[in-house]
Amino acid sequence: MSVEVGSKSLSPWAPEFRHISFRGSIARDRFVYGHEPWEGNERGKVTLSEDEESFLRFLFKEAGLDLYRYRLKTIKRRIGACLRTLHANSFADARRVVQQKPALLPAAISTMVIGVTSFFRDGPVFEMLRNEVIPTLFKGRYGLAIWCAGCSDGPELYSLAMMLAEMKLLHRCHLLGTDCRWDAVRRARAGQFDAAAIKSVPAELLARYFTQQETHWRVKSVIRDAIHWRRADVLTLHEPGIWDLILCRNMTMYLTPEASAALFPRLEMSLRSAGALVLGKAERPLAACHLSTVGPCMYRRDR
C-alpha cells in the first residue's frame, strides 16, 4: 500500500511513519498459561466424549489453532453445525473429509469459531474515537498504525476507515485486520455485504462509500484498498508489531479464562506508550496490565 501526499508517494514504512515499529518479538514464555484441557470449573459443567474431543483436537490442529483456548460450552454446541458443513454422519467421516478435501477446512473452522460484529457497533465508542482519541493520537505524528484483531468479516474496521476518510486522515493511516478464520478474512477483503448488514451505516456514508450490486452492497475501492487483511491468530501471532490503536472487541467471551489472561498482556505489549485499546462492553483488562480507562470500552497504555 502507498499513499499520496501532493506528488509524493509514501509507503506505510516511509520516514513519516518511523514511529511504527515491526522489529523485535514477543517471547512466547512471557505469556505461558495452562494447556491442560479446560482447566477450572468448566470441565465439570460440560463434557465431551472421547470421539468428540479427538475430532476437535484434529480439526483445530489442522487449522493451526489450540482447541483448549476456547470455551468448551461454545465449542460443544457448534459440533453439529460442523458435521453438517462437512456432510458427515460421524466423526470418522468428518476427519476423512477434511483429510481428503483440505479446502473444506476453512468452512469447518468457521462453524466452530464464530464472530459477531456490525458496522459502527456501539455509537458512543466511535464518537469518542472521532472526537477525542484519534485527534489525540495524531498529535505530533504524521500517521497512525491501527490493528483490528479478530476482525471477523470486516464491518468494524471498514467503519473506522470511513470515519478516517471523513476526517481526511485515511491516507495517513496503516490499517490491518486479522482473524483466525480464512473465510472471515476472505469476506473482509471482498468488502461485500447484504442489506441486513449495512442497516447501521448512515445513509450519507452508504451513498459515498458503497456501490449497490443487485442484492448486495460493496465497499468502494477507496476504502477497501486502504486496509490490509491477514489470516492470523492473535493468541499466537509472534510479532504483532507496535500499534497506535488496537480494536479487539468481545474476543474473550469465546476464550477460556487462561487464554483471556494471556491475551491482555499481548495487546498491551503491542501498543505504543499512550496508545489506545478498544474492547467490548463486558471486557476489562487485567489489573496487572498498565492500561487506564479513558471512556466506554476505551483504554490507554500508561507506559
Predicted regions and their residues:
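Residue-level signal for inorganic ion chemistry
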Residues: 129, 246, 271
